[in-house]
């Protein structure tokens, strides 16, 4: 659903107040957090979508990694999950089994128990997880925690929406995008695991609203301005080439329509870069706000494990009447 339509629907919903609900949908966070102890929160999220690849096992891996990411984005660790599978009967049990096996593979890697699930017949396959986990409340992260002076760390390259659109249009072969699919299958656990002893202020995962959209939510939730250094943002191979050809997914245009009025971009950006920044991601990385020294140390630890980590911006004082996000070259 387009972000503007989603905001309208959620704004009209009645709800029952509960003091133990520490994070709900009103702050556009990645998951809910419900207090279950003095320093313990139950983190819950749900996510599912149709396939972007032909390989059912790979699809299951990507969908599960994407679902698990919301728990990591809150600073938590997933504990158990429920499968959600929509499958056409014509695809048969073998395809369904491969999708579920791909999801199970990522859950085992995450140490997350699959406790059950639900399946329905549908015209188009869709898969994902309802995931629960736990977080120490004094280590809980939210997209509203960014502070002026923080640096911003991004833990995966972007451009998956553009590249998968190019694959569907037969402009790129799927095997040319192997590094991108490996990234989409990679769990977002490492930045949280490796942040031990570091001070993190805010976090969100970069998914359907694109890097700009999620940065905008972080800026508005934290009452700050985010400056994105576009030249520092890691991109998958051929992203800018495809963007310059106009290979842009529909979700990118929806993101531009909704977030664009709150974004200012310098005129000297590299051609195609703004499209890449609005590009909706599947199983994208984490965008972390933290003091510069802690960001540098976390990046060093991630690089030591061979992982992507790029300082892509900073958190600034808000400008009255100004943009939530300022994109510079």
Spans of model-derived segments:
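Short, compositionally biased
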Residues: 164-178, 305-308
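Glycine-rich anion-binding loops of enzyme active sites
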Residues: 36-53, 58, 77-172, 314-316, ...
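Small-aliphatic-rich amphipathic alpha-helix that forms the alpha element of a beta-alpha
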Residues: 56-82, 98-109, 187-199, 206, ...
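A generic local secondary-structure boundary/capping motif
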Residues: 21-23, 31-34, 70-72, 104, ...
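Active-site glycine-rich loop that binds ribose-phosphate moieties when present
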Residues: 130-140, 175-195, 269
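Glycine-/charge-enriched secondary-structure boundary and capping motifs
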Residues: 89-113, 120-127, 197, 207-329
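Short pre-catalytic strand/loop immediately N-terminal to key active-site residues, enriched for Gly-Thr
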Residues: 57, 176-183, 201-202, 273-278
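N-terminal glycine-rich phosphate/pyrophosphate-binding loops that anchor nucleotide-derived ligands
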Residues: 1-73, 112, 147-153, 157, ...
């Amino acid at each position: 659903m387009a972000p503007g339509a989603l905001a309208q629907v959620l704004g009209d919903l009645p709800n029952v107040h509960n003091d133990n609900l520490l994070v709900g949908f009103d702050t556009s966070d990645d998951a809910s957090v419900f207090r279950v102890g003095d320093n313990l929160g139950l983190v819950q999220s749900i996510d599912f979508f149709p396939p972007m690849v032909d390989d059912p096992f790979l699809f299951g891996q990507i969908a599960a990694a994407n679902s698990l990411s919301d728990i990591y984005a809150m600073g938590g660790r997933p504990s158990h999950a429920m499968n959600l599978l929509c499958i056409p009967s014509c695809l048969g049990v073998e395809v369904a089994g491969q999708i579920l096996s791909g999801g199970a593979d990522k859950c085992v890697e995450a140490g997350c128990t699959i406790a059950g699930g639900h399946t329905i017949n549908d015209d188009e396959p869709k898969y994902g997880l309802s995931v629960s986990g736990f977080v120490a409340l004094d280590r809980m992260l939210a997209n509203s925690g960014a502070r002026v002076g923080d640096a911003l760390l991004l833990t995966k390259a972007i451009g998956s929406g553009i590249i998968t659109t190019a694959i569907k249009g037969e402009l790129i072969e799927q095997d040319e995008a192997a590094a991108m699919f490996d990234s989409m299958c990679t769990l977002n656990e490492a930045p949280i695991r490796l942040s031990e002893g570091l001070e993190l202020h805010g976090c969100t995962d970069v998914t359907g609203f694109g890097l700009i959209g999620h940065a905008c939510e972080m800026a508005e939730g934290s009452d700050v301005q985010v400056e994105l250094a576009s030249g520092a943002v890691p991109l998958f191979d051929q992203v800018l080439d495809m963007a310059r050809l106009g290979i842009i997914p529909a979700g990118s245009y929806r993101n531009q329509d909704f977030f664009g009025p709150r974004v200012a971009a310098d005129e000297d950006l590299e051609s195609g870069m703004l499209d890449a920044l609005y590009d909706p991601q599947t199983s994208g990385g984490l965008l972390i706000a933290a003091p510069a020294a802690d960001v540098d140390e976390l990046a060093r630890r991630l690089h030591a494990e061979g992982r992507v980590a790029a300082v892509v911006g900073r958190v600034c004082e808000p400008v009255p009447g100004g943009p939530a996000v300022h994109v510079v070259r």
